[in-house]
Amino acid sequence: MYEYKKTGVEKLDAEAASKNLYGITVPIITAETTEEEGRNNPRAPFYAVYKFILDDLASAEELLSDYQRPTKNLPCTPVVHGLMARMWLEMGSRFELYPEDLNTLNNNTDLNIASKETCFTKAAEYARKVINESGAMPLTEKEWFGGDSYTTGFNSVLTNSWVWGSIMTTEDVHSYWLNFAGSMCPEQTFGYGNRKWQGYKLIG
């Protein structure tokens, strides 16, 4: 979720404030969004996107409850719970830094979150669900850095700690820009984010 956060760099933070960038994220697009609506769809406030993400994940949890995926590049219930853990951790961290944002969220949604501690508790609960459901375990420090082989650790989707990952084959890479990273990594200098396409400007 793209959202400007305070950096501590006075010039950047002041410019963000002057442009009213604090607290707004990305436009919300649903299956029902029409082309006309999409052309006039401003960036949504953080609380609306938090609500949208949580509702979407709750729906995914229900729809995937009996699904058995064939490969790790497809989502499943533990993946949904992992995303829920990340979402609640993001919210808890936000409300810890900016307590006033909790009131803003509760005044504009029906989430009724009691405190930052509630968020951290939820994050821990969902993280534990991921471990229990998937059998995945966090990497040790040695494993994180590749252990005795730099082809393991987080370098391979086959590692047990990976719950969800991209499995790239030669069939997925058609050119230097027509590939997953070329579309999804706007900060890089190849793909749609390069100087020619200037895709990086689309997230500003």
Spans of features found by a protein language model:
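Structured, solvent-exposed acidic/aromatic patches
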Residues: 2-204
